[in-house]
Design a protein with these regions (language model features):
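Catalytic cores of nucleotide-sugar-dependent glycosyltransferases that transfer UDP/GDP/TDP-activated
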Residues: 1-188
Length: 188
C-alpha cells in the first residue's frame, strides 16, 4: 500500500489542528476541508490511478464524496470507484465558516446540492458525506442524534459499528459486496 500526504503550508503548518488555543474552531477549517478533498482527488488523477474504493474517515473528509461524484463526474479515473465514508462521533460544536456552501458552489457544484451545508455543522457535514457515498460505515459506538437519524435513513449499504478487533473480516466482506454492487447492510 502506498501512502501519500496532502499538505499545504498555509493550511496545515499550524501548531493546532481543528481548534485554537482557546478551543475555538480554526477559522479556515472550511477551506482546509475543500483543499483536502480537491487535493486528494487531483492527486489520484495526476498519478493516473483508478481506485476501486476511496474510503473517507471523519468530518474533514466529508466533501470528498461530493467532489468525487459531482466535480469529477465523468472522469475515467473515478468511473468505477466506490466511495465509502466512515462516520464518527468525534467532531465539533458550532459551525465552520458560513460561506462554505458558496465556496463549494464556486467549484462548479450545483447550489442545490450544498443546501445542507449552508449551516456547516458537524451533523451537516456528516450528512453530506453520507448522501454522496456509495456506502457508509458507522465508526463509533454512538453517534450524535441527528447524524444517527441520517445514518438510519440511508438507502445505500451500511455497516453498523463493530469493535475494531471484530471488524477486519467484516470490512473485507463489506468492501467485496460494494465492489460487486450488492445493496446490503452489515449488522454489528
Amino acid at each position: 500500500m502506498q501512502v501519500y500526504f496532502i499538505d499545504n503550508e498555509q493550511y496545515f503548518k499550524k501548531k493546532v489542528t481543528w481548534f485554537d488555543a482557546k478551543d475555538k474552531l480554526v477559522p479556515d477549517n472550511d477551506e482546509r476541508a475543500i483543499f483536502f478533498a480537491r487535493g486528494v482527488l487531483e492527486t489520484v488523477r495526476k498519478l493516473s490511478w483508478a481506485p476501486d474504493i476511496i474510503h473517507c474517515h471523519g468530518w474533514m473528509t466529508s466533501l470528498v464524496p461530493l467532489y468525487a461524484k459531482q466535480m469529477f463526474q465523468g472522469d475515467a479515473h473515478f468511473e468505477n470507484t466506490k466511495i465509502i465514508s466512515s462516520i464518527y462521533d468525534e467532531g465539533f460544536n458550532g459551525t465552520l465558516n458560513g460561506s462554505l456552501h458558496e465556496k463549494v458552489a464556486y467549484d462548479g457544484i450545483s447550489p442545490e446540492l450544498v443546501q445542507d451545508i449552508k449551516l456547516p455543522t458537524f451533523d451537516a457535514l456528516n450528512k453530506i458525506a453520507m448522501e454522496h457515498s456509495d456506502a457508509v460505515v458507522c465508526g463509533s459506538e454512538a453517534l450524535p442524534t441527528e447524524t444517527q437519524e441520517a445514518f438510519n435513513a440511508l438507502t445505500q449499504p451500511t455497516m453498523r459499528y463493530m469493535e475494531p478487533e471484530l471488524s477486519s473480516a467484516e470490512m473485507t466482506t463489506f468492501y467485496d459486496s460494494i465492489l460487486e454492487g450488492k445493496q446490503e447492510a452489515v449488522e454489528g
